[in-house]
Regions:
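Alpha-helical segment proximal to the catalytic Tyr-Lys
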Residues: 121, 164-168, 229
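Residue(s) in the substrate-gating loop at a strand-loop-helix junction
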Residues: 135
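Active-site helix of classical SDR
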Residues: 116, 151, 159
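Catalytic Tyr-x(3-8)-Lys segment
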Residues: 194-215
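Substrate-binding pocket helix/loop in short-chain dehydrogenase/reductase
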Residues: 92-93, 97-102, 200-201
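Conserved glycine-rich cofactor-binding loop
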Residues: 15-16
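C-terminal substrate-recognition "lid" of short-chain dehydrogenase/reductases
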Residues: 113, 209-238, 243
Length: 244
């Protein structure tokens, strides 16, 4: 399928994990990609995997409004925005440090807000789509993820606001909510000491399998495409039945 032929698609967090898989999926479907990450080395690796020579890569800290504003100043076309960039940390809630709280909220939630805010004029012109990566942590109860869960809950709520506010103008805004996925961010995390291992079962899919980022990328591609034209303002769980 070439659902994104000649479409300009922007993917944040494209240096690894779900972001990289999404970029490769979009590339395979004909998109002209703009891929973004804060990690230049990993971003270059992703860029080297893309077949479309019109695609570009940009190192960008999405949590810095001046940098985001400058980036969008020279952008004149956009058909889809896919916000994947995010960070994760595990702590007992009473031990969360304020600097860690602020950093996670700034990248995950505020960064997503900045990207959407500056992309909106272009997306309204193209009647495009926004897909924000939220999490099953936004919808269920995940231990040790106070800041992360708060940030992802905010993304889900913010996305619904955009869907209602701009849906009449032809913009679709949806969230994908993955459960545990095999990515560099979630593999071998630093967990708090002396955790109750029974709580780990509450963040695992029914079959106990951490799926590939490719399975999230295919869902993102669907929501960003015209196949999902009548889907707006949803949290699409890709969680293996975790929250069922």
């Amino acid at each position: 399928m070439k659902r994104f032929k000649d479409k300009v698609v922007l993917v944040t967090g494209a240096g690894s994990g779900i972001g990289r898989s999404t970029a490769l999926r979009m590339d395979s479907e004909g998109a002209i990609l703009i891929i973004i990450d804060i990690n230049e080395d990993e971003l270059i690796k992703t860029k080297s995997m893309l077949k479309n020579k019109e695609s570009t890569a940009k190192v960008l800290d999405i949590s810095t409004i001046a940098d985001v504003k400058k980036f969008f100043k020279d952008l004149n076309k956009l058909d889809a925005l896919i916000n994947v960039a995010g960070i994760l940390r595990f702590d007992n809630s009473h031990e969360v440090q304020i600097d860690d709280w602020k950093k996670i909220l700034n990248v995950n939630l505020t960064g997503t807000f900045f990207m959407c805010s500056y992309a909106l004029p272009l997306l309204l012109k193209s009647k495009g789509a926004i897909v924000n990566v939220s999490s099953s942590a936004a919808l269920g109860s995940h231990a040790w993820t106070a800041a992360y869960s708060a940030s992802k809950g905010g993304i889900s709520a913010f996305s619904k606001t955009l869907a209602v506010e701009y849906g009449m103008e032809g913009l679709n805004v949806n969230c994908v909510c993955p459960a545990s996925i095999e990515t560099p961010m979630s593999t071998n995390p630093n967990m708090p000491k002396d955790i109750d291992t029974r709580l780990l079962k509450k963040i695992m899919p029914i079959d106990g399998v951490n799926r590939s980022p490719n399975e999230i990328a295919s869902t993102i591609a669907f929501l960003a495409s015209e196949d999902a034209i009548h889907i707006n303002g949803i949290d699409l769980r890709v969680d293996g039945g975790l929250l069922t």
